[in-house]
A protein has these predicted regions:
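An N-terminal hydrophobic leader/cap segment in hydrolases
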Residues: 303-338
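Generic alpha-helical hydrophobic packing signal
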Residues: 3, 12, 294, 309, ...
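Intrinsic-disorder/low-complexity peptide segments enriched for small residues
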Residues: 103, 316-319, 361
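Short, charged, solvent-exposed linker or helix-capping segments at domain edges/interfaces
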Residues: 68-69, 321, 361-362
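Residue-level recognition of strand-loop junctions within catalytic nucleotide-signaling folds
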Residues: 39, 300, 352-354
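Beta-propeller folds
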Residues: 1-294, 302-304, 314
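Alpha-helix boundary/capping detector
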Residues: 274-275, 300-301, 393, 414
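Cap/lid segment of the alpha/beta-hydrolase catalytic domain
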Residues: 327-416
Length: 416
């Protein structure tokens, strides 16, 4: 069940279901269009085995109508006792995942741009223009079997295309800012050394990360690479934050708690105020209003079990709207610590202790390493760690060699 709530009055504006699909992401495309990305495990007689079939849905708050975007559902046909299937969207390859991805929004035409594989025998990765009103799609740009990504501007003009061939090992980036396709980057490798993740506000540069440590840019006219532009010592670049058109809005760093780099200094000051107000927790900026006055933030750690709050920057006021775990009465203390391995390498770790300080002496300890191994534990409300501390244990979550989040040295030390 999805609920759309007015942040000011906390009144429910709409509620709806997206069928049997598992929700993966939810966000606003416009003030009245909510995008829901979901998936479910399916099988298809033309495809061996099962795969996670994903879709994007749009919910119109005014009409209260839920519409599927770029539908690859199978329409079965029988002809001469031969079972045939055709996708509901003409020429769309039926057995593919990742169909919920949106890479652009045209506000004037109320259309979104979605990449997908077309063709049955030799599928190629194209871009479709999809109506938010009807969900109907038309092929907008044609790629090839090696195409893996696209970049467009706000009106749908194609700016760049990324190709990678597993057969030849060629990694290619093409620019179309001049009106014609021009090759601006070429490299041969078993896997791409990087992949562009965002585009600049002026549509002139692509941004990418190197070993998750620093952010670099590539000029779309010449292919010149500049950087490092952003980076913090002892932290990975966790995420390049973008809008729906993949324009870079900020850089989020990892570590024990997140930190951000915004292009606007006032935004940096706002986040600094939030992080200082919740010094023992992780503060994530989940979204911002169009005028940038209201921020939706997620606080998790010693100050809350996953609380969502809205910051009114003009009034300097925080309003709680909901919590992930509303019935949690008390939280065991979460400490960010460092200890030395036998060879002197500093290992960052999370130590969680019982809520009662009187019960923190001579505790048995449980080591709870994360999965991955390319992952890391942070200051957050971890239900399993909290459960174990409530039973009288101390819980240590080490970010061992090979863990991400704390810079290249720690991650590289796990390679042996």
């Amino acid at each position: 069940l999805f609920v759309v709530m007015n942040a000011g009055t906390q009144a429910v504006s709409a509620a709806f279901r997206a069928g049997t699909y598992k929700a993966r992401n939810v966000y606003f495309a416009t003030d009245k269009h909510v995008i829901i990305v979901g998936s479910k495990t399916q099988k298809h007689y033309q495809v061996r085995g099962k795969w996670e079939n994903s879709k994007a849905f749009v919910y119109n708050i005014e009409t209260q109508k839920l519409t599927t975007l770029l539908d690859n559902s199978c329409v079965e046909r029988s002809q001469s006792k031969i079972k045939r299937c055709k996708s509901r969207t003409s020429s769309l390859f039926p057995g593919q995942s990742g169909l919920g991805r949106i890479i652009g929004l045209n506000k004037k035409s109320r259309e979104v741009y979605m990449p997908a594989y077309s063709g049955l025998r030799k599928p190629h990765y194209d871009v479709y223009r999809v109506s938010l009103k009807t969900g109907k799609a038309k092929r907008f740009a044609t790629g090839n079997a090696s195409t893996i990504d696209w970049f467009l501007n706000e009106d749908g003009t194609v700016l760049a295309r990324e190709d990678f061939s597993e057969r030849t090992g060629e990694h290619l980036i093409y620019s179309k800012t001049s009106g014609e396709w021009e090759l601006i980057y070429r490299n041969e490798a078993d896997i791409p050394e990087f992949s562009p993740q965002a585009i600049s506000q002026d549509n002139k540069r692509l941004f990418f990360t190197s070993f998750n440590e620093n952010v670099f840019s590539m000029a779309l006219d010449t292919g010149e690479i500049t950087g490092p532009l952003f980076g913090q010592e002892g932290k990975d670049v966790g995420f390049i934050v973008t809008d729906i058109n993949r324009k870079m809005e900020s850089i989020r760093y990892s570590g024990f708690t997140p930190s951000y780099s915004f292009p606007d200094q006032k935004d940096n000051e706002t986040y600094k105020m939030l992080s200082e107000y919740y010094p023992a927790s992780s503060v994530y900026v989940e979204d911002r209003s169009t005028d940038n006055n209201k921020w939706l933030v997620h606080i998790t750690g010693n100050d809350g079990a996953g609380d969502y709050r809205i910051l009114d920057r003009e009034k300097v006021k925080l309003q709680k709207i909901l919590a992930e775990y509303p019935d949690i009465a008390a939280i065991g203390e979460i400490r960010a610590i460092n200890y030395k391995a036998r060879d002197g390498l500093k290992i960052p770790a999370i130590l969680t202790l019982p809520t009662d300080p009187e019960k923190r002496k001579n505790l048995p300890l449980i080591a709870l390493p994360h999965g991955g191994p390319a992952s890391h534990d942070t200051v957050r409300f971890d239900w399993l760690a909290q459960y174990l501390t409530a039973k009288g244990y101390a819980v240590l979550q080490p970010n061992f060699r090979g863990s991400t989040g704390f810079g290249y040295e720690l991650k590289n030390s796990g390679d042996g």
